[in-house]
């Protein structure tokens, strides 16, 4: 399944990222850890669960080493009045090669806990992540600079409840991580389309169309680089 690698890596990061761990209760954290261990055991790699968790911790530290989000936020606010957002994002987009390495290391570390058929997706997943970063950092971050300048973050904050409702609807429809893993590729693509359409519809209610349009472009870009592009091509 195309999303199993993503699921395993998210579980691993969710277990060990301090910021996430403080946002959920201890029982939920343990459930995530147990699910990760079960996934590893299922594929004869129970002894690798701790390695995956350690890799996730290293990933979090890797990202923190590249980006101080408090500093970035201040730099963005300082740059807005001067129209210098492109300079801020150009500086951080220059770190994209290191970020790609962080991601590749994490996904590679997760492979022992995956079925053999899914391990074949590690390359495409890494390529997809690279393309996503390149999309965001197009022309040294022009896209994200425009997104910020056009009130993108404010739009997302304003519509956070609607976006959360979209995610909750998907969660209720799927049921569980195990149920998500059992979906066929076409079904997974359908769920992705439902979720992204719901999010776009919510963002389109903002005062400016830019955030919704950019989100739609991003979602389509991600989809085009995934197996969904061939398995369940869009009609338009």
Curated annotation (Swiss-Prot):
Subcellular location: Secreted
Pfam families in the record: DUF1397
Identification of the protein by name: 27 kDa hemolymph protein
Top-level taxon of origin: Eukaryota
Keyword Signal: yes
Keywords, sorted A to Z: Secreted, Signal
CC per GO annotation: extracellular region
Family designation: Belongs to the UPF0408 family.
Organism: Galleria mellonella (Greater wax moth)
PANTHER family registered for this protein in UniProt: EG:BACR42I17.2 PROTEIN-RELATED
Quaternary organization: Monomer.
Disulfide partners: none
Tissue specificity note: Hemolymph.
Extent of the signal sequence: 1-17
Lineage: Eukaryota, Metazoa, Ecdysozoa, Arthropoda, Hexapoda
């Amino acid at each position: 399944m195309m999303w199993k690698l993503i699921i395993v890596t998210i579980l691993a990061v969710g277990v060990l990222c301090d910021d996430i761990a403080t946002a959920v209760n201890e029982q939920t954290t343990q459930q995530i850890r147990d699910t990760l261990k079960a996934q590893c055991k299922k594929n004869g790699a129970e002894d690798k669960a701790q390695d995956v968790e350690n890799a996730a911790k290293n990933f979090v530290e890797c990202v923190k080493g590249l980006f101080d989000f408090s500093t970035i936020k201040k730099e963005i606010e300082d740059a807005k009045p001067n129209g210098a957002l492109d300079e801020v994002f150009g500086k951080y987009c220059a770190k994209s090669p290191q970020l790609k390495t962080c991601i590749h290391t994490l996904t590679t570390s997760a492979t022992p806990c995956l079925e053999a058929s899914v391990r074949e997706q590690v390359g495409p997943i890494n390529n997809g992540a690279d393309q996503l970063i390149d999309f965001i950092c197009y022309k040294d971050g022009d896209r994200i600079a425009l997104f910020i300048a056009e009130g993108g973050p404010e739009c997302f904050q304003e519509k956070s409840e609607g976006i959360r409702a979209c995610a909750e609807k998907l969660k209720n429809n799927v049921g569980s991580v195990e149920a998500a893993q059992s979906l066929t590729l076409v079904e997974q693509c359908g769920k992705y389309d439902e979720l992204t359409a719901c999010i776009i519809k919510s963002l389109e209610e903002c005062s400016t169309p830019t955030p919704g349009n950019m989100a739609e472009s991003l979602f389509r870009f991600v989809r085009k680089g995934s197996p969904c592009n061939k398995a369940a091509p869009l009609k338009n």
